[in-house]
Amino acid sequence: MLALKPSGRLARWSILVLGLALTSCDALDDLISVEAPSRVAAEDLDNPANAGLLVGSAINDFRCALTHFIGAGAYIGTEWGVGGDTGGGSYVWYDARVFTPGGWTAMYATGDCSGDAPNVYEPLSTARWMADDALRRLDEWGDAQVPDRTELTAKAAAFSGYSLTLLGEAMCGAALDQGPELSPAEIFALAENRFTRAIEAAGSAGATDIGNLARVGRARVRLNLGQKAEAAADAAQVPEGFAYEFDYSGADASTENKLYVLMQRELMATVEEPYRNMAFQGQPDPRVEAVDLGLQGPGTDIDMWAAAKYPTIESPVAVATWEEAQLIMAEAALDAGQLQSAVDIFNVLHDRVGLPAFSSNDPAEIKDQLIYERRAELFLEGQHMQDIERFNLPLVPAPGTPFYHGGVYGDQICFPLPEVEYLNNPNISR
């Protein structure tokens, strides 16, 4: 059964992804396998009784897109390398950091959520459109027609916000609903607006978990926009222990944990060396545990390592956590010159996992430690690619370095606006 699992300070619980009152796991599985809304009759979409289904479908689309996004970013950054011989597949282009708007290296844009490779543009665009379409319909319907309209509005706005956030982090530019090309900053501004709406609606509906999810999301986009004080203000409201996760299942390709699939079933992704034996002051960091599978990638001599974080096809994946919020606060404190506050946050996180304390009053050392903490705490959670951009981290291997599968490494850390937009969008031209 697929579920969303928000966690509070003292409790952990699951809610049904479609937000409907179902009486059996089979009923939920049937609904998760429902036809894509694009193939559902228009009169069904316009029926207020289906509001929960529409919002749940949008959330389901985002759940699938999330692991695709994380995988793509892991290849582009230093978390993953390609394990097997893909015959020129898109995995290679991700790892080599070489993309073009069209052709074979544009599979990031043309593949859907059921594809083998981690696709980005179409899955995230679909999730965003579904959430915004649900929002539009909820605005047209009244509370009498949809008794839980306010809570559904909070959910739709929150996942529209997250879809936009990941689009802004992944893409060099993107278009929405055949509109003009938007820069990442413009996309982040739209995401901030959606999160604000989600926070307000969640407050009115008493949906604490969705409100905290949206606060972490708004803090994330505000950090991306350079609004660190505002980001910290949001993050400070997130309670200790909060986590919002998706569960996955082996029901079909769209419900699988793609990270597990690529590392352990297909052997197409291997944890890169910097993460295989990550340690702080000589002590292994339990937040980043990599397992030597004792195998080599298909058709290669590349050693295969997998993240212990995702041991099965059902392994949950975090969308937002208290730990992420704390690191946002630490970054804002460092930016404001409150060095000890940042250090204190690191040490709270260290204490929770049994690591030695960090100590420094040197801003450069504290910044380096912040980068380390984000690498460890947010390992394979979809944050690394944007951190490369925000912190201007060196690309490893460096551009121009010979690539195992031929050619050399490139320097692209975002995906270009795809050719499909130039061909089909009247508001975009070359």
Regions found by a protein language model. Give the residues of each.
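Conserved, well-structured interaction surfaces
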Residues: 52, 91-170, 197-205, 313-317, ...
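Hydrophobic-face positions in mid-chain alpha helices that act as interaction patches
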Residues: 91, 100, 105, 192, ...
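Membrane-proximal, proline-rich intrinsically disordered regions
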Residues: 25-78, 396-430
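Short coil/turn linking the two alpha-helices of tandem helical-hairpin repeats
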Residues: 166-176, 206, 224-227, 337
